[in-house]
Curated annotation (Swiss-Prot):
Pfam families assigned: Globin (PF00042)
SUPFAM superfamilies for this protein: Globin-like (SSF46458)
Record's protein name: Cytoglobin-1
Gene Ontology biological process terms from the UniProt entry: nitric oxide catabolic process; oxygen transport; removal of superoxide radicals
Annotated compartments: Cytoplasm; Nucleus
Catalyses which reaction(s): Fe(II)-heme b-[protein] + nitric oxide + O2 = Fe(III)-heme b-[protein] + nitrate; Fe(III)-heme b-[protein] + nitric oxide + H2O = Fe(II)-heme b-[protein] + nitrite + 2 H(+); 2 superoxide + 2 H(+) = H2O2 + O2; H2O2 + AH2 = A + 2 H2O
Keywords: Cytoplasm, Heme, Iron, Metal-binding, Nucleus, Oxidoreductase
Coiled coil: none
Main function: Probable multifunctional globin with a hexacoordinated heme iron required for the catalysis of various reactions depending on redox condition of the cell as well as oxygen availability. Has a nitric oxide dioxygenase (NOD) activity and is most probably involved in cell-mediated and oxygen-dependent nitric oxide consumption. Under normoxic conditions functions as a nitric oxide dioxygenase (NOD) but under hypoxic conditions the globin may switch its function to that of a nitrite (NO2) reductase (NiR), generating nitric oxide.
Length: 177
């Protein structure tokens, strides 16, 4: 059963990252990124299993229902790698706000214009990322580190929502309110 979007409302509000949060995010990410393929696949499989409507944007595997089959999909694995590389670029650039803005702008534009992805899925994906990383890396994802990640993902969601608004995304008022 799909969860309600209210479960990720904490991703609606962001504030600038502190220096301490930047360091915690970068340190924790270094551990996660060592297993980026497995982590990325776990995140996308969880997204598609818990939120099956998110598969509508992926013609290559939207028909696959079984989690094990999803894990084996080469197309899913490729997209998981792209997601993890985008997060890696973001995390590596946390000291450069222009680079962060550029990355988020490019991701937002590509998903709005080319892929026509409803922006609510960025909030949903962010919640899934927090959930999977917390389960897979419990020693790394302490409450304090998870809070820093929540703030980073809120920044991501707010920035991408702003890109969609700038582009005049037609469904924005219905999807992320």
């Amino acid at each position: 059963m799909e969860r309600k979007q209210g479960e990720v409302d904490h991703l609606e509000r962001s504030r600038p990252l502190t220096d301490k949060e930047r360091v915690m995010i970068q340190d924790s990410w270094a551990k996660v990124y060592q297993n980026c393929d497995d982590a990325g696949v776990a995140i996308l499989v969880r997204l598609f299993v818990n939120f099956p409507s998110s598969k509508q944007y992926f013609s290559q595997f939207k028909h696959i229902e079984d989690a094990e089959e999803l894990e084996k999909s080469s197309q899913l694995r490729k997209h998981a790698r792209r997601v993890m590389n985008a997060i890696n670029t973001l995390v590596e650039s946390l000291d450069n706000s222009d680079k962060v803005s550029s990355v988020l702008n490019a991701v937002g534009k590509a998903h709005a214009i080319r892929h026509k992805v409803d922006p609510v899925y960025f909030k949903i994906l962010s919640g899934v990322i927090l959930e999977v990383l917390g389960e897979a890396y419990p020693q790394v994802m302490t409450a304090e580190v998870a809070s820093a990640w929540t703030n980073l993902l809120a920044i991501l969601c707010c920035s991408i929502k702003a890109v969609y608004e700038e582009l005049g995304w037609p469904h924005l008022s219905n999807s992320t309110s």
